[in-house]
Every structure is written in C-alpha cells, then in structure tokens.
UniProtKB/Swiss-Prot annotation:
Tagged with keyword Membrane: yes
Motif NPA 2 mapped to chain: 184-186
Record-marked site positions (Involved in tetramerization or stability of the tetramer): 20
UniProt source species: Brucella abortus (strain 2308)
Swiss-Prot/TrEMBL keywords: Cell inner membrane, Cell membrane, Membrane, Repeat, Transmembrane, Transmembrane helix, Transport
Name of the protein: Aquaporin Z
Location(s), subcellular: Cell inner membrane
Site positions per UniProt: Selectivity filter: 43, 172, 181, 187
Length: 228
C-alpha cells in the first residue's frame, strides 16, 4: 500500500507543481507569457506524464474526485479511498508550499489568488457561484467518463494517459475563465492554504462539486455506457 500512496503523493505533487506553477510563474510573464492555453496544456501534460510514470502502481488518480468515481464504478476498493485522499491532499499541499516559496522570491510578490479557485469576486471572469457549481459538476462527470472509458477493456491498450491528459486540457480551456478550473479537490486545497483567506472560504464548492460530478460520471458509465 505504501508504494500506491507514494505514487499518489508524487503524482498529485507534480500536477499541482506543474499545473499551478505554470499559472503562477509563467502565465503572465512579460511578452512571453503562456496564457490560458499554456496553463491548460501544462495541467494536461502533468497528468499524462505521471500516468505513464506511476499509473501502473496506483492507477494514477492524483485527484480525490477521480478516486471516488473509480470507487463508485468498482475500480478502487472502498477501503483505499480515504488513504488515497490523504496522500493526494498532502502532495498538493507540499507542491503549493514550494511554489509559494519560489514565487515569493520575486520582488513585489503578493499571494493574491495564487492560482486558487473561486467564484464571484474570485472568478477570473466574474462568474456566479451557481455557474461555478454547474461547470465543475459537469466537467468532473465527463472527466470520470473519459477515465473509465479510456481505461476499460474495450479501449486500445496504452493510450489512456493521452486521452485523460487531453481531456484535462480541454476541461481547463473551457473553465479557467469561470472558476480557474478545479475538478480536483486536492489541487484546490493545496493552493487555497497559501492564497488570500477568501480562497479558503470558497473551498467548499471545490470539494462538493467535483465529488458530486464524480459520482454522476461513474453512475452514467456503469448504467449506460460501460460493459467492463
């Protein structure tokens, strides 16, 4: 079990360090900033690379919502769910802490949002709580469907990380303006702990919506789509 939890810790660390790090350090870099597209690609690439690296050890979840969805779908034993969540959240916090130290090394640094998720005043586009709730539920549900489908016995072998990585990239392209994209409670928790206090006050949504979406996605797959 230790090797599985270690894989989830380091996989989630890489997701937050690479994805949120690209948003914090590189998205708006003068003249050469990578922008929304670059950040979306960064998140997708973190999952793709670590899924190939450690997916064979733990399943490559790196996300409490994914672990819940796979539990509902019968792919992860229920007894493993909470240990996976703990490893994922700790990995996210460790990555966010290091990003905070790196980012604070620049003159004029302000924690600000620190790539945190939010709605209302904390939404990049000023979207409401309801908009944030809906988009996070819907996108997480589809993310679970992508994961379950691409890792099923019916899918071509060896290509699941590519589908999952590109799926997460698309999710970010759609929802960065709305919530700064979560679909991952661990990712949201890690950076919220080091951002402005307001981010913590809205963190509940980025647990509730992805977890609800994960259950919906798993039910859709099991009831309507899956045969494995």
């Amino acid at each position: 079990m230790l090797n599985k939890l270690s894989a989830e810790f380091f996989g989630t660390f890489w997701l937050v360090f690479g994805g949120c790090g690209s948003a914090i350090l590189a998205a708006a870099f003068p003249e050469l900033g990578i922008g929304f597209l670059g950040v979306a690609l960064a998140f997708g690439l973190t999952v793709l690379t670590m899924a190939y690296a450690v997916g064979g050890i733990s399943g490559g979840h790196f996300n409490p919502a994914v672990s819940l969805g796979l539990t509902v779908a019968g792919r992860l034993p229920a007894k493993d769910l909470i240990p996976y969540w703990v490893a994922q959240v700790l990995g996210a916090i460790a990555a966010a802490a290091i990003l905070y130290v790196i980012a604070s090394g620049k003159d004029g640094f302000s924690a600000g949002g620190l790539a945190s998720n939010g709605y209302g005043e904390l939404s990049p586009g000023g979207y409401s709580m309801m908009a944030g709730l809906l988009i996070e539920i819907i996108l997480t549900a589809f993310f679970i469907i992508i994961i379950l489908g691409s890792t099923s016995s019916l899918a071509p072998a060896g290509f699941a990380p590519i589908a999952i990585g590109f799926g997460l990239t698309l999710i970010h392209l759609v929802s960065i303006p709305v919530t700064n994209t979560s679909v991952n409670p661990a990712r949201s928790t890690g950076v919220a702990l080091f951002a402005d206090r307001a981010a913590l006050s809205q963190l509940w949504l980025f647990w509730v919506a992805p977890l609800v979406g994960a259950v919906i996605g798993a039910i859709i797959w099991k009831g309507l789509l899956g045969r494995d």
